[in-house]
Amino acid sequence: MAKKNKPTECPAGEKWAVPYADFLSLLLALFIALYAISAVNKSKVEALKTEFIKIFNYAPKPEAMQPVVVIPPDSGKEEEQMASESSKPASQNTETKATIARKGEGSVLEQIDQGSILKLPSNLLFENATSDAINQDMMLYIERIAKIIQKLPKRVHINVRGFTDDTPLVKTRFKSHYELAANRAYRVMKVLIQYGVNPNQLSFSSYGSTNPIAPNDSLENRMKNNRVEIFFSTDANDLSKIHSILDNEFNPHKQQE
């Protein structure tokens, strides 16, 4: 009688099941972790973020504003224009502080948790709606801003921000709103440096036609959106000090109330 042969068993037996089970366990853990991340409690995260800010005295950048920085070309023509803009320093001796302050009427100082923002309408600063040439009358006002900056703690950082409205650019050398806003912010920053502000405290950003403060549905609102902002940022230790100095300089009537 013929002997039956046993079926050949896999040499590895059931060993494959162990690593396969481990793989499934890891895959399950991954999906649980992904679900936990997606279902995170935003209020708890914000509370934790606030506590870390207090601990490290860190002033975060507003999340809603994401600038695009455009570096203007460093041309000889630009240097000549900058020189002509600051070619009349002698007149400053005949200007009183009140007269200089009147040149900046229309500017707005806003105090925030991260520092202060001085908003300057572009129709005050520049020759026309699509120009980056600073009005000669405003040079003394920018000089005054530079002197005020020099009174602030050295840890204060100043970011000059350029904004435009959404009017299409026609018959201008600028290819985009970002480029126009960048050149404007850059020029204001250069004048601040000329009047003695430490370059290490300065930077500039361009937001183009993004982040409007009013709907672009009227001439008045477009003038509000077409602006340069000087953002004074600092840590919690110097916050009350810069608020006090800037309020005293730009909003003196507040101190009298």
Swiss-Prot record:
Localization of this protein: Cell inner membrane
GO MF term set: identical protein binding
Single GO cellular component term: bacterial-type flagellum stator complex
Ranges where the OmpA-like domain occurs: 113-236
UniProt topological domain (Periplasmic) ranges: 38-257
CDD domains given in the database record: OmpA_C-like (cd07185)
Transmembrane regions listed in the UniProt entry: 17-37
Residue ranges of the region described as Disordered: 74-100
Cytoplasmic side: 1-16
Keywords assigned by UniProt, alphabetized: Cell inner membrane, Cell membrane, Chemotaxis, Flagellar rotation, Membrane, Transmembrane, Transmembrane helix
A biological-process GO annotation: chemotaxis
Membrane topology qualifier: Single-pass type II membrane protein
Pfam families: MotB_plug (PF13677), OmpA (PF00691)
Positions of disulphide bridges: none
Job description of the protein: MotA and MotB comprise the stator element of the flagellar motor complex. Required for the rotation of the flagellar motor. Might be a linker that fastens the torque-generating machinery to the cell wall.
Family indicated by similarity: Belongs to the MotB family.
Protein's recorded name: Motility protein B
Species lineage: Bacteria, Pseudomonadati, Campylobacterota, Epsilonproteobacteria, Campylobacterales
